[in-house]
Every structure is written in C-alpha cells, then in structure tokens.
Amino acid sequence: MLTFFFLWISTLLLSSFIVYLLYRRRSAQCPPLPPGPNGWPILGNLPQLGAKPHQTLDALSKQYGPLFRLRLGSVNVVVASSSAVAAQFLRTHDVNFSNRPPNSGAEHVAYNYQDLVFAPYGPRWRMLRKLCSVHLFSLKALDDLRPVRQGEVACLVRNLRRHADTGVLVNLGKALNVCATNALARAMLGRRVFADEDAQLAEADEFKEMVVELMRLAGVFNVGDFVPGLGWLDLQGVVGKMKRLHRRYDAFLDRVIEENQANAKSGDLLSVLIRLKEADAEGEIKLNNTDIKALLLNLFTAGTDTSSSTVEWVLAELIRHPDILQKTQHELDSVIGRDRLVAESDLPNLPYLQAVVKETFRLHPSTPLSLPRMASEECIVNGYKIPKHATLLVNVWSIGRDAAVWNDPLEFRPSRFLPGGEREHVDVKGNDFEVIPFGAGRRICAGLSLGLRMVQFMTATIVHAYDWSLPKGQECQKLDMEEAYGLTLQRAVPLMVQPIPRLSHKAY
C-alpha cells in the first residue's frame, strides 16, 4: 500500500514537471505582448491620457518604443507611433484591422453605426464607399465639380475683401469652413447651405460650432466605452451631450432632405441616394432615410472641418515664418501674376505651395490620432502578439514629429519635400507612412482627393490674394500655436487676422 502511495506521488510530481516544461516551452515560443505602463484598478490607463492624448501617447512612445500597449478599462489598446510600425498594421495586416471597435459616438451620433466611417467592414460599407467614390470623389466627378469649387473660393475672396475694406478682423477658420461647406453642399445637394447675407452668418456660426463639438466629443475617451459596467452612469456627461448634438444634426439633415426633395436636381448625390431609397432592385442593398442622413453627416463633418482647420494652420505657420510666406507668394506671382485669382488648374505648377501644405500636414495633421481599428484575429506585429479584438490607434501626430525620420522635426521647413530635400518623394495619399493625414489602407479617407485639392486651392488663393496682419500688439513670432484636442486638431485660439489686398483691383 505504501509503495503504491509513493508511486502515485512520483507520477503526480513527474506529470506536473512535464506540464511545467511544456508550459515554459510554449511561453518561450509565444511572442510577448507589447510593453506598456501599469494602470489603475478597473480604469487601467484611462486617467493617464490627459487633455491631449496624442501628446501623452507621444511621450509614452519615447519610453516604451514605437509599439506599446495600454489597458483602457477592460480593453487592450495598441499604439503605433512610427511610420514603420504603422505600415505593418495598415499595409501588411490591413484586412485584419479593417473593422472598428464599439464606440458610443457611432451609436449615439452616427445613427447607430449606419454611417460610412463606423460601418462594419463588409458589403454595405463597400456599397456606401462606392457611392461616394463614383458621385463625389472620382476623377470625373472632381473635374465636373471644379467650377463649383472655384465659385465658392471666389466667394471666400469677396468675403475677405469686405473685411479688408472695412478694417474688421476675420475669424479665418469660420470663413474657411463656410467655403468648404458650401462647396461640398453644392456637390451633395445641388445648392449652398449658407448664403452671403448677414442673416445667415448666425446659421453658419452655429453649424461650425456643431462640427467642432462633434469632433471634440468624438475625440473623448469615454469611460463607458472601456468599462461597460460604468456606461449607464455617463460619468463624463459625454453620452448626454452626444444625444443632444444628434438631435440638432438630425433636425438639420431632415431640413436638408426636405428642401432637396422640393427642389430636386438629378445630378447631385442626395438625389441619387433618394432614388436608391425608392428603388426595388433585387439583390441590391436598399437605403432608408436613416442611412442617407448618416452618410450626409459623415460628409458634412469630416469633409469640411478637416479642410478648413488645416488651411487655418497653414496660414498661422506662414504668418510665423514671413520668409516662407514671401517664397510662397513669389512662386504664386511667377506662375499666375497679379491680374487674376488662382485657378485649380494652376496647382500642379506650384511645387513650393504643395510643399508648404505637406509640411503643415506633417506638423498639424487634421486627425492627430487615427480613427480606432480593431483586430479581427490575433496576429504578430514587430515581434509582439496583438490579441484578438485589441483596439489599434495610430499616432499620426507622433509619426510626423519622429526625430528618427525627420531632421529638426519641430521646425516648419517645406524645403524638406522639395528636390534635394530629406523626403522629396513622400506623398500624403497613404503610400508613404511618414505623413498620413488621411490614413492608409482599406479604410483610408474616402474624400482624400477632394480634401487635398480643397486645402491646396484655398491656401493658394488666400495667400496669393492677400497679405495678412495680426491684431494690433500681437507679434508674428509669438502667435499662439496651442492645440485644442479632438477628433480633428483645432487651434485652441481661433486665428483672427486682417486681410490686406495685394493683387490688381480687377482680380477681385
């Protein structure tokens, strides 16, 4: 009996030892999770993100490397902070990261994931993207709508001229937002949404405020998204604000659709969407009113504020660097002269202007943190295990300031993108990951081509048509460049400037 007992104990110990060896061997073969900071109980690293998460994450990348991990509540989050790591996620593993994680903004503002930006990757998403690509963003559509953009930019010039004549400072961001919104609205709806009359200035201000509020709320790391058990408490008040903002947008979009149906023009995007809603083609994915409003919401917000805020940053940098402003204006005068305004067809002949825009995208990307993506399956990136359902954030802001890639990364230096410069061949269209303001991969911004044209065109026009001065007492070199974090990168202090005409009278 005693012999049997010792035999049993020996077998148990031997089995345990074998299991331990197998576990050690498997652990040695299994890649580790990315490194990262310790977090708080329950909340994880959420309290550490601060008011400007893109800057916090940039600082953490200096400590933990270009790929690190956070625990936000119960959610694994991996952060890519270099162009090389971003390329592995968005090129090598693009399919695996083509979905979005659950998000309160998508639920409460974007019609419960019915929009293009947050829709699950699949047939419906492809259909929505195709609709936008064919009717708004294809080369043919862009060329057909060129007169629309030129007309709206000409309206912007006239608006600025009124400020110049009266000596009244202009809030440049708002003026640019009206221009971008009307240009997009004429393509989407066949008409403008804001007129030049003073009666509609308040409406334009309200719309700009709604867009900024949406982008701010969309950039908040809502505790309820990461600790579902606390969601009902709405500790930050974010969900309540989202629901109120949604009601305002919904009323605005209802009015837009009703007015379009009363004055329908067959060529605009909304008319096409309404026809698809009424169609009964077998096998086609049909649209309902909610689908249409969700898509319009995407286009009106992402397609307007990103462009206008970028141009605002461009002009702020040029005001701070008079020598670069002078070079830009010299190129514009050489190509266009001073007797007419810039035409969109002039843009390919303005390499220095294009470099100025690229440099602004590098330092002030319109979306500092990429929209989150989610791992559909476990994978290996940069030697680390990325768990299934982990959320991916690409720190676009950090990539543009990476000292391992850029010489003097905090300096505004457009020449780095010119022939002989350190990154002369880098583009911003998702092919080169050093500058990715529009994202990359399958879920790259659908409006990339239009957005790039509008930013270049508005920048070229206002820099060519006007000199710029700051309010009395402000020095160019001391211009406030503080950021206000949100889904888009706003200026903390709006750029208030005085335009000074520099072209011949007949050009205006």
UniProtKB/Swiss-Prot annotation:
Hey, what tissues is this thing expressed in?
A: Expressed in young cromes.
Signal peptide range equals none
Which co-factors does it depend on?
A: heme
Residues recorded as binding heme, renumbered to this chain, are C445
Residues crossing the lipid bilayer are 2-22
Q: What are the record's GO terms for cellular component?
A: membrane
Where does the protein principally reside? Answer: membrane
Catalyses: a 3'-unsubstituted flavone + reduced [NADPH--hemoprotein reductase] + O2 = a 3'-hydroxyflavone + oxidized [NADPH--hemoprotein reductase] + H2O + H(+); (2S)-naringenin + reduced [NADPH--hemoprotein reductase] + O2 = (S)-eriodictyol + oxidized [NADPH--hemoprotein reductase] + H2O + H(+); (2R,3R)-dihydrokaempferol + reduced [NADPH--hemoprotein reductase] + O2 = (2R,3R)-dihydroquercetin + oxidized [NADPH--hemoprotein reductase] + H2O + H(+); kaempferol + reduced [NADPH--hemoprotein reductase] + O2 = quercetin + oxidized [NADPH--hemoprotein reductase] + H2O + H(+)
A UniProt-annotated Pfam family: p450
What UniProt keywords are attached to this protein's entry? Answer: Flavonoid biosynthesis, Heme, Iron, Membrane, Metal-binding, Monooxygenase, NADP, Oxidoreductase, Transmembrane, Transmembrane helix
Q: How does it sit in the membrane?
A: Single-pass membrane protein
InterPro entries with a match to the protein in the record? Cyt_P450, Cyt_P450_CS, Cyt_P450_E_grp-I, Cyt_P450_sf
Per the UniProt entry, what are the Gene Ontology biological process annotations, in alphabetical order? flavonoid biosynthetic process
Gene Ontology terms for molecular function: flavonoid 3'-monooxygenase activity; heme binding; iron ion binding
Question: What exactly does this protein do?
Answer: Flavonoid 3'-hydroxylase that catalyzes the 3'-hydroxylation of flavanones, dihydroflavonols and flavonols. Converts narigenin to eriodictyol, dihydrokaempferol to dihydroquercetin and kaempferol to quercetin.
Report the family membership. Answer: Belongs to the cytochrome P450 family.
Name of the molecule in the record: Flavonoid 3'-monooxygenase CYP75B137
| Biological source species | Crocosmia x crocosmiiflora (Montbretia)
Classification from the root reads:
Eukaryota, Viridiplantae, Streptophyta, Embryophyta, Tracheophyta
User: Gene name?
Assistant: CYP75B137
